Regions:
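C-terminal lobe and adjacent flexible extensions of AdoMet/dcAdoMet transferase-like proteins
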Residues: 201, 209-263
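A short glycine-rich, Lys/Arg-flanked "PGG" loop and its adjoining helix->strand segment in the class I
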Residues: 128-140
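Short alpha-helix
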Residues: 185-202, 208
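Conserved class I S-adenosyl-L-methionine
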Residues: 1-51, 56, 60, 144-172
Length: 263
């Protein structure tokens, strides 16, 4: 199945709009990502979000005064994004693919977010194109924030219920390198592979952070419970330690942050 068709088929049947609200790990992912967005761009500026989904980040940033251009590939998500953006004159929602940003000039945005496209780009040429295009349209000195899935967390979260053999075969080759292949809806990375994607690109690495930590794995337990007070305490702990390298691979979602080199 072609990538765009596969993505549209998935999101036609999956309600993305409340994903970051309906679970503790989703709430933590959102809070952590917004924390780093504000660290990179504390004052409202121009933001490009690629793979904007239904607008959870784009709408929030527009309400804070940022000038947001939100690009989404999936038709159902784009429909919901436009509904959620009604009344926000500083948010423009467009359909498009992160691998081709030819509609935008070089150095157009203060901050560029890719908080979803790299989950679905199994082809190396597409991954390289998405990163290069994001860097191109970001101004010199601006930040690019890219979300990735940990291949190890994919295994931990989905393949420890009597289906380990399937998880290993689907996500790793015989030498335990992460697999990326056609018809793979979600593709994961290990840390060295993820970081190597930026080798030779005109950026300076800033940090790599775990955005939801072990909460997705923990929340899968039947006896999991976390009150609002406990969540606030855990979130404070998480933000203090989420950049520590030994905690990265167990997080389902990872956030790579880099700064575009000055010309």
């Amino acid at each position: 199945m072609e990538r765009t068709e596969m993505i549209n088929s998935f999101y036609d049947g999956y309600y993305e709009d409340t994903r970051l609200e309906r679970s503790r790990h989703g709430q933590l992912e959102y809070r952590t990502t917004m924390h780093f967005i504000h660290c990179c761009q504390p004052q409202p500026g121009s933001v490009l979000e690629l793979g904007a989904g239904t607008g959870r980040y784009s709408v929030a940033l527009a309400k804070e005064g940022y000038r947001v251009t939100a690009v989404e590939l999936a038709e159902r998500n784009l429909e919901l994004l436009r509904q959620n953006a009604r009344g926000l004159g500083n948010l423009t929602a467009l359909q498009g693919d992160a691998v081709d940003l030819s509609r935008f000039a070089d150095d157009s945005f203060d901050l560029t977010l890719l908080l979803g496209p790299l989950y679905h780009l199994y082809d190396k040429r597409d991954r390289d194109a998405a990163l290069c295009e994001a860097i191109r349209v970001t101004r010199s000195g601006g930040h690019i924030l890219t979300a990735f899935l940990s291949v190890h967390a994919i295994l931990f979260d989905n393949y420890l219920q009597g289906n380990l053999a399937d998880g290993l075969a689907e996500n790793f080759d015989a030498d335990y390198r992460a697999r990326h292949f056609q018809d793979q809806l979600f593709t994961g990375y290990d840390i060295p592979e993820l970081e190597a994607l930026y080798d030779g690109l005109p950026v300076t690495p800033v940090t790599l952070a775990a955005t939801n930590g072990i909460l997705e794995l923990a929340e899968g337990r039947a006896d999991f419970a976390m009150s609002d007070e406990e969540f606030e305490a855990y979130a404070a702990y998480h933000l203090r330690f989420c950049e520590q390298r030994e905690l990265l691979g167990s997080s389902s979602h990872l956030l790579h942050i880099c700064r575009k080199s000055c010309k």
